[in-house]
Structure formats: structure tokens, C-alpha cells
Amino acid sequence: KMGYWGFFPADEQWGIVPVWGFGTVIASKHPRAQVGEVVYGYFPMGTHLLVNVDKANDVSFFDNHPQRVSSSPVYDNYLRCAQDPSYQEDSQAWLLNYRPLFMTSFVLDDFVGEHISDKVTTVLLTSASSKTAYGCAHLLMKHKAQRGGHYRVVGLTSAANKALTESFGCYDEVLEYKDIEQISRDGESWVLDFAGNKQLLLDLQDLLGEKLSREIFIGATDVKSQTNKPKGKLHGQLFFAPHQVKKRTEEWTREGFNERYAKAWSSFNAHMQDKIQVVEYQGAKAIQDLYQQGLAGTLNNEEINVLTF
């Protein structure tokens, strides 16, 4: 449905899981792809990737392999780490785990800043313990004053994740899902939905009524709720990060976009350094076991993982 099996096609009955990662060029017949250089981008969950280098410049290159079918050019782009202002070799673990998510956090915060009005007093983020959500929350808090905003940044999460989410220090307030009645209705609200739980969204629509001025759908971390399809119409809009990336890249230039992103990333990375532990896994069996934990929803939210074959 989301097109993920098209990135690195396999035989019909199989799918190759795509992951964000770092790769080192070990052989090249293209003058703009140098052996030994490190690049960041979308890779198959494997040891090697053969690319057809296209649109190469000093900052990045694209893969135009004919078998590859991507939903956006963002996924075909490989960034040269030597030219990346946000790259540091000793922070690879953080970039691996957060960069693709924080890129969404970054452009979503930018989108909010572009469209939010001074009538909005509450910005609600569901699945508040998810990386994309609390990355965005950090930026919403950071940019509140310079935007002249009067909003409070409120996270909604499960009872099990409430204390952890509060410890991140990215929200004005964190509420359990069962406590949504405590949400202020004094002014207008935005909902940034990362959970994809339709029943929760319907409950928020009923609770906030006309005070809900915007509802944005970003993700679907609540996998179990996807089988539950309650009746009722949602009134929001889908946020597709690559569209905002493309818009701002055209307006700010690629260099300007990367500089703004690097500044935001530096702020978030410094804020989170003492709150998350890096754990490394090696070998196919360890990777498979961790993948199964992800499917079961049992990953440790206090850890970020680095996987190598």
C-alpha cells in the first residue's frame, strides 16, 4: 500500500526491507562516485547495493536503477557525508536512528510555523513517545517564542510510556490517552497524529468540536489499531514530508535547507544525548530478532540501535 517493496524489488513472493543507513563505496566506474567515500541514504537490509549513479554533484548523487520504483526522489538520493554539515562520524548511531524521522520532525515543525494562527493555544501530538513526535515537539517548543506563538505543546501517550516521555523534556505537558478530557478548550487546537488510531481521532474530534482547527496525519505507530475501523469521518489532511522538503529546497536552495536542518538537528541532538543509550547488534540473527521485536511492539524506547552484518 505504501510502496515500500518497490524500493529494492525482489522475487514476487518476497520483499526486501529498506532501511536508512551509511554505505562505503567499494568499487566505482563513475567519476563522481569515489571509492572510499561514505554516503548516507536508503539501503536494502543487506550487505551490498549496486547503484546507477545519476545527477551527481558535490553534495549527493541519485540512483536511477531501472528496477527501482520509489514514491519520491528523496529515497533515491545519497548524501556525501564529507559535505553534510550535520554529519559527525562519532554521531553515526544518532543519525541512523533519527535523521529520517527528524527530517519529518523538521519539515513538520516548519509547516506548523507557516500555517498556525495566534488563535491556536494547544498543539496535540499523539504517540508522543515516538521519535518523530518528540523531535517535532522539541522544535515546536524551541521556536514558540520567535513565532510569537501562544500554544502549549501537549503529548498524548500510553500509561506505560508517560514517565519516559516526560523525562525527554520536549513537551509542556504529557497526558495519557484516557485523560484527553483534561485537554484545554479555551482556544483552538491542532492535532498532529503519529498514531493512526482512528477511534482516538474521532474522540478528539468529538471532544474539541469547532475548536479543532487542523488535524494532520503523519504516521501510524499504533499498529494494533489498524484492524479496528470504527464508523465516522476524519476531517484532517495527510502530511507527506518529501513535498515540504521539495518546497523548501526550491525556496531556500539545497545548501540553505541543509544548513537550517543542521542547526535544528544540533539543537535536538544536544538535548537528547543524556537521555538515550546506544546499543549495537551484529549478524543476521541479531538483526532478525530485533526486527521481530519491532513487529511485536516490544522495542526499548530508551535505546537506539545500530545494526551491522
Positions of predicted regions on the chain:
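N-terminal Rossmann-fold NAD(P) dinucleotide-binding loop
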Residues: 133-134
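C-terminal hydrophobic helical "lid"/dimerization subdomain
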Residues: 247-309
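Adenosine-nucleotide cofactor-binding segment
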Residues: 145-201
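Extended repeat-based interaction scaffolds and adjacent low-complexity, acidic/S/T/P-biased segments
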Residues: 139-142
